[in-house]
Amino acid sequence: MTTHQESVDVLAIGAHPDDVELGCGGLLAKLSSEGKRIAILDLTRGELSTRGTPNERHAESEHAAAILGLCARENAGLPDGGLSNTPEQRLAVIPFIRRFRPKVVLTLMTPDRHPDHEAAHYLGRDACF
């Protein structure tokens, strides 16, 4: 997916490809249909998943981006199974937020039984300063 040149209305941050779609895909589709500029930041490639290889998940995420009408979708390349709200990982997320300049940031809900989902929530929240 090509990246954008302007700020976005909404940046949705998920731990793995498909997290954002499962959590708020309907909302993003609605906002996109209303002309809002929407972007997704996947923090990992989902490389530890038992539901497809990283390449398959990437292809699925590109297909989902087209369906949702996203203006951009990026991947931070952080380790699947190793997300943590550390200064180092926040520093990996901050450049995306600065580049997208979103009006609204959506993250995963907390509490969550998956530690990467919980960490994604706090990383997204704390990287917005």
Predicted regions: what they are:
Residues 96-129:
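Active-site adenylate/phosphate-handling loop in enzymes that bind or generate adenylated species
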Residues 1-100:
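Active-site rim/loop-helix segments in enzyme catalytic domains that contact anionic ligands
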